[in-house]
Swiss-Prot record:
One of its GO terms (cellular component) is large ribosomal subunit. Part of the ribosomal stalk of the 50S ribosomal subunit. The N-terminus interacts with L11 and the large rRNA to form the base of the stalk. The C-terminus forms an elongated spine to which L12 dimers bind in a sequential fashion forming a multimeric L10(L12)X complex. One of its GO terms (biological process) is translation. HAMAP family: Ribosomal_uL10. Coiled coil: none annotated. One of its GO terms (molecular function) is structural constituent of ribosome. Signal peptide: none annotated. This is Large ribosomal subunit protein uL10. Belongs to the universal ribosomal protein uL10 family. The gene is rplJ.
Length: 171
């Protein structure tokens, strides 16, 4: 890798650290190429991405960023997983690590907050942004639905009473 490629890599990583809300760092030693491809595929499906880069270049890219606290984790064969959704990268990484013990989650960062491995696992159990939005919409719609049911209930009861009288008279 020549100097220009290294500079381009650092700029790319800096842009990633500026645009993402969560970064997860993990050791990937012992993963086969097929397993790494599977990890990347699962990350893409979750709306996250995985990148492997030289630790020194990652540390340079981290300087001055909000997630600079993860620089200490960059030792050995590490990968970074990141996403715009605050929980997508953590969920995908933890799910893959459950099935494959060779992926060891070291920690990460969410904004300026540094996360240890347990915090990343806790983050993975939280609902995603889309799930929270769906719950919020459901909560907002619930009173309107109940109001509509209450308004329609008396008319329905009246119709059933009239129907019962009609059946009684017919018999």
């Amino acid at each position: 890798m020549d100097r220009a490629e290294k500079k381009e890599c650092v700029e790319s990583l800096s842009e990633v650290f500026k645009s993402t809300s969560v970064v997860v760092v993990a050791h990937y030693s012992g993963l086969t190429v097929a397993q790494m491809q599977n990890l990347r595929k699962q990350m893409r499906a979750a709306g996250a991405a995985v990148q492997v880069a030289k630790n020194r270049l990652v540390k340079i890219a981290l300087e001055g960023s909000e997630v600079a606290s993860i620089a200490d984790l960059m030792r050995g064969p590490t990968l970074i997983a990141y996403s715009a959704d605050p929980v997508a990268a953590a969920k995908a990484a933890v799910a893959f690590a459950k099935d494959n013990d060779k992926l060891v989650i070291l920690g990460g960062a969410m904004g300026k907050t540094a996360l240890n491995a347990d915090a990343v696992k806790s983050l993975a159990t939280m609902p995603s942004l889309d799930e929270l939005r769906a719950k919020l919409v459901g909560l907002i719609q619930a009173p309107a639905t109940k109001l509509a049911q209450l308004v329609n209930a008396p008319a329905g009861k009246l119709a059933r009473v009239i129907s019962a009288y009609a059946e009684k008279d017919a018999a």
